[in-house]
Amino acid sequence: MENNEPVVETPEAQNDLPEVERLKGEVEFLKAELEASKNKFLRLYADFENYKKRMVQELEAAQRNGKFDAVRALLGTLDDLERALGFASVKPEDLIPGVRSVLENFTRSLKSLGVEAVPGVGAEFDPRYHEAIGAVEGEEGKVMHVYQQGFKYGDLLVRPARVVVGSGAKPEEAEA
């Protein structure tokens, strides 16, 4: 049996039509807003990926430039050492002023790179910068001898100074 009767809309169904149209409009608006947000996210993601790549490149360039500056600062010392070898046939005592000059230039080069010597003889022993390798009679807690110079780069310790530290008063002073 077929139902060929025309569909008659009830007044309630007619009242729902404006609501359906409003909801369709809201759905379209939300779809457009979602698409805009998605596009914004994709642009931000691409920008962030480009930023990460740029930061890696800048870090590599900074490291390369730092090494370049260090090499350039030390080339003068290399030149001085090569000149000193040219005087190898000279008496050893005649080489001392030249070697001293090379040492001074090398120290200046290190200082230009921000490298400084750790305080040595006469300084208070500081375990942050000194490594005690022995003790001798002398003022307690003072560095008496530097076996190997220590260096720091800013706040970073490159190498501790290996030192001999004073152990206290001499025996004859203690008895008096």
Swiss-Prot record:
Record keyword Metal-binding present: no
Subcellular location per the Swiss-Prot or TrEMBL entry: Cytoplasm
Keyword terms: Chaperone, Cytoplasm, Stress response
GO molecular function: adenyl-nucleotide exchange factor activity; protein homodimerization activity; protein-folding chaperone binding; unfolded protein binding
GO biological process: protein folding
Pfam families reported in the protein's UniProt record: GrpE
InterPro entries cross-referenced by the UniProt entry: GrpE (IPR000740), GrpE_coiled_coil (IPR013805), GrpE_head (IPR009012)
GO cellular component, one term: cytoplasm
Top-level taxon of the source organism: Bacteria
Chain ranges passing through the membrane: none
Broad class of the protein's primary localization: cytoplasm
Function, as annotated: Participates actively in the response to hyperosmotic and heat shock by preventing the aggregation of stress-denatured proteins, in association with DnaK and GrpE. It is the nucleotide exchange factor for DnaK and may function as a thermosensor. Unfolded proteins bind initially to DnaJ; upon interaction with the DnaJ-bound protein, DnaK hydrolyzes its bound ATP, resulting in the formation of a stable complex. GrpE releases ADP from DnaK; ATP binding to DnaK triggers the release of the substrate protein, thus completing the reaction cycle.
UniProt subunit comment: Homodimer.
Family: Belongs to the GrpE family.
Protein name per the record: Protein GrpE
